[in-house]
């Protein structure tokens, strides 16, 4: 006999029925309302969703600007324990638990083990400053007069129980604490800088912050104030699991070993045999186990290693095909690239490794697998795609608004980006937003000559000493005036020549300018970006590259 069915043939039907049952249960799930009319008064300063905690309901009607001298629960708490929350901050129950549980854990759990840890949750401010701190450490961490004055202020604040050591990103903490490269004063200074800056901060942007001024003198430049958030999600995961998309299923004949396939050609020649072999293989327990194994390897092992060990970041969540992470702004492109390559097990091209200065020690990606410290991990493979959204924001920007922008960026990558794309939204503190959406791959199945490579190379070009960032501003000025009557094919040489000319005028080598002009023009007119105007592609790419190339992020200085 050619094939004898067994009970396993019922698995696809059973899975489909259970999937429909679970989907229908969601649509009829009850969501009871809060009793007595729900929330009242002003909302939590952090989440903006629930009323803030109080011992007197009348206090809930006091506007934020008038709470300073009111006898609220939070003003009482801050007066007794200054490090409990920020000045004037009034939190709801959930936000309070999130704010206080790290302190409780440190005092009641780590304290039993004689581990001296004040804080282990990385704040957005600390993450932003970590970009400048890493550069300071690479310069040998000189203390100088400014550093000594900051250490004195740290002693005074600690004596008053008004100072917590900052939790630095793991990568930076390892560099700081391992070996004998840095002494006790340098280590203490690095861990107290963010806290000292926050202690002297004010809601008034014009207010003088003496601590921030001293930190600027210590670091040699104004401390970095921007950080990034990443949200990555696998594409069409439902179709991969349910097997409803034929493009994500192999033909039955392709699941056999090549030698067996050759024998089958000679032995099974009847039409019904060929119809069976050409049919798409139905979903099975082994397929679901393979997908589960691949997603576990990515989420539980690779995601944290990439975000926290190879970049200055903090993994917030990793489950299956979903990843959310905080990352220092100078590591944004590197983190995005490594996460995407790790999801599908794609090799990272050498030019990207060099340009982004990727840390691949102990990690090898390729062939749908990863080899991490000698451990082989199965991944989703090159045909599985993932889309990512990223937001660059000021550390003082409302986190709720930043998260909404992050989710919108991820939807933009999956919607207008056409999936297998990344979207970066740049939120400048002065106002306005730049939205860049690019595919991960154009024509090749790998990341070679990818749009990310173009973006990374432009960032490195502007960060160098030869090319002025003025090239980005000048180009953005004439982009809106492109002739609308020209088709994309005719527009390519015009864009390439003009981009090369502008780059050469601002100091780029002629051959290099021609190369970058051609790459950027090719990206702008590519059919994959047909829904986006070429002018918008170039303008937004240059804007993001120029922002990431500024001295506080690139570490390069030039004559002004």
Segments from the language model and where they lie:
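Regulatory and interdomain segments flanking nucleotide-handling catalytic cores
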Residues: 1-560
